[in-house]
Amino acid sequence: MSRVAKAPVIHSANVEVTFVDGVITVKGPKGILTQKINKLVNIQHSKESNKLEFSPASNDPMGWAQAGTARALVRNMVQGVTEGYTVTLELVGVGYRAQSKDKSISLSLGYSHSIEYDLPKGVTVETPNNTTILLKGVDKQVLGQIASEIRAFRPPEPYKGKGVKYAGEQIVRKEAKKK
């Protein structure tokens, strides 16, 4: 039995939550997010106390698991439309650079060509310096997917640690071969 679903999601007064036909919509100061919710989950919304409570719709064994998943998704949506999310990537290596443009980012990662990555709607990019990329947006899943795709262009290698890594990520280093 999940304990995640038992905790309510409390949102601020400037967040509007609607639940119609299995689709929940969260509207806040930074944007609007929608998510389809499993039919095994009941959602009770108390507008006076700005509280969302999740419970299983039936005695199905997967009910509490789905309720916990739905609660986590809705909590991420509420946090996204109020505060937003930021993912920081670091480029480690000689000549590795990033430049942000309007809706794309240009990466120079040691290949014979530079890589142009177009960003989807709702995601902004900043490059405070040549080796740091700041991705900002309201949808946590989309932001993580973009960061993962950018990291996949040149993942950190274990010998020198060169590549694209998340800020704060510890790269497990290997020792070089000894004669």
From Swiss-Prot:
It holds the Pfam family Ribosomal_L6. This is Large ribosomal subunit protein uL6. Keywords: Ribonucleoprotein, Ribosomal protein, RNA-binding, rRNA-binding. PANTHER family: 60S/50S RIBOSOMAL PROTEIN L6/L9 (PTHR11655), LARGE RIBOSOMAL SUBUNIT PROTEIN UL6M (PTHR11655:SF14). Part of the 50S ribosomal subunit. The keyword Iron does not apply. It comes from the Bacteria. GO terms for molecular function: rRNA binding; structural constituent of ribosome. InterPro entries: Ribosomal_uL6-like, Ribosomal_uL6-like_a/b-dom_sf, Ribosomal_uL6_a/b-dom, Ribosomal_uL6_bac-type, Ribosomal_uL6_CS. The lineage of its organism: Bacteria, Pseudomonadati, Pseudomonadota, Gammaproteobacteria, Legionellales. Belongs to the universal ribosomal protein uL6 family. GO terms for cellular component: cytosolic large ribosomal subunit. GO terms for biological process: cytoplasmic translation.
